[in-house]
Curated annotation (Swiss-Prot):
This is 4-hydroxy-tetrahydrodipicolinate reductase. It catalyses: (S)-2,3,4,5-tetrahydrodipicolinate + NAD(+) + H2O = (2S,4S)-4-hydroxy-2,3,4,5-tetrahydrodipicolinate + NADH + H(+); (S)-2,3,4,5-tetrahydrodipicolinate + NADP(+) + H2O = (2S,4S)-4-hydroxy-2,3,4,5-tetrahydrodipicolinate + NADPH + H(+). One of its GO terms (cellular component) is cytosol. Catalyzes the conversion of 4-hydroxy-tetrahydrodipicolinate (HTPA) to tetrahydrodipicolinate. The lineage of its organism: Bacteria, Pseudomonadati, Pseudomonadota, Betaproteobacteria, Rhodocyclales. Keywords: Amino-acid biosynthesis, Cytoplasm, Diaminopimelate biosynthesis, Lysine biosynthesis, NAD, NADP, Oxidoreductase. One of its GO terms (biological process) is lysine biosynthetic process via diaminopimelate. Pathway: Amino-acid biosynthesis; L-lysine biosynthesis via DAP pathway; (S)-tetrahydrodipicolinate from L-aspartate: step 4/4. Its EC number is 1.17.1.8. The active site is at 156 (proton donor/acceptor), 160 (proton donor). NCBIfam families: dapB (TIGR00036). It is found in: Cytoplasm. It is an enzyme of class 1 (oxidoreductase). It comes from Dechloromonas aromatica (strain RCB). (S)-2,3,4,5-tetrahydrodipicolinate binds at residues 157, 166-167.
């Protein structure tokens, strides 16, 4: 099988650099293109310069032109930009891995529609460990379905713009689904003042933002006399990059369809 050609959006950012590095170190992949926004200091540099590895792919802001050189575009940017890139990929017949979070319902609907024409892997967290945690949460919620209060605590760096994180929300969705509940109806986002006694049917969320925390997520099942916690902590962004590249390789066997990391990892 020939190497999968990867394109990276946001090449000059922290996640973009990590994706470039991971791609260049994987002999099953080829970096075909690297993109960044107009005005970025990364423009005109080679991807190799950004990560200190041999590579002569030049960073450009012309995504439409660069798509002809790739099989899969990986995007960890902002919802508005991601949807623009998605439409370009759809027109070019190029698959897409979307790690961007913070989409509203209408944005998710656009992604689902595009996946009728191209393969799309869309997941709130690409790390393999987090997706194993999703599976563990499903099992735990079904067993601890009576007498346990459920709280989700997440922490990220000071620059993260959405809260709760997409991963925390997905954890809540997994737990709520296993319990036969609708997260939109049972979620409580933060507490303040005299809140009254806790409603046992709710799922609570707490958010921490500070420093350079890459990503910590804990789901607590709080019973009487015991507490079960399922935690994932990321110490670098490399797990997200490696999971994204695994998703890109997975897409090589699909012409269209909407997938997530549970599909990629065979956890369905």
């Amino acid at each position: 099988m020939s190497a999968t050609r990867i394109g990276v959006v946001g090449a000059g950012g922290r996640m973009g650099r990590m994706l470039i590095e991971a791609t260049l170190k994987d002999d099953r992949l080829v970096l075909g293109a690297a993109f960044d926004v107009p005005g970025s200091p990364a423009l005109g540099k080679t991807a190799g310069e950004l990560v200190g590895l041999p590579c002569d792919v030049v960073v450009t802001d012309d995504v439409a032109a660069g798509l002809k050189n790739i099989d899969c575009l990986i995007d960890f940017t902002r919802p508005q930009g991601t949807l623009v890139h998605l439409e370009l990929c759809r027109k070019a017949g190029v698959g897409m891995v979307i790690g961007t979070t913070g989409f509203e319902a209408d944005g998710k609907a656009v992604i689902a529609e595009a996946a009728k024409d191209i393969p799309v892997v869309f997941a709130p967290n690409m790390a393999v460990g987090v997706n194993v945690a999703f599976k563990l949460l499903e099992t735990a919620a079904r067993i601890l379905n009576q007498g346990y209060d459920i709280e989700i605590v997440e922490a990220h760096h000071r620059l993260k713009v959405d809260a709760p994180s997409g991963t925390a929300l997905r954890m809540g969705e997994v737990v709520a689904s296993a319990l036969g509940r609708d997260l939109e109806e049972c979620a409580v986002y933060g507490r303040e003042g005299v809140t009254g006694e806790r409603d046992p049917s709710t799922i609570g969320f707490a958010t921490v933002r500070g420093g350079d925390i890459v990503g910590d997520h804990t789901v607590m099942f709080c019973g009487i006399g015991e507490r079960v916690e399922i935690t994932h902590k990321a110490s670098s962004r490399m797990p997200y990059a490696l999971g994204s590249l695994r998703a890109a390789r997975f897409m090589a066997g699909h012409k269209s369809g909407l997938f997530d990391m549970q599909d990629v990892l065979g956890l369905r």
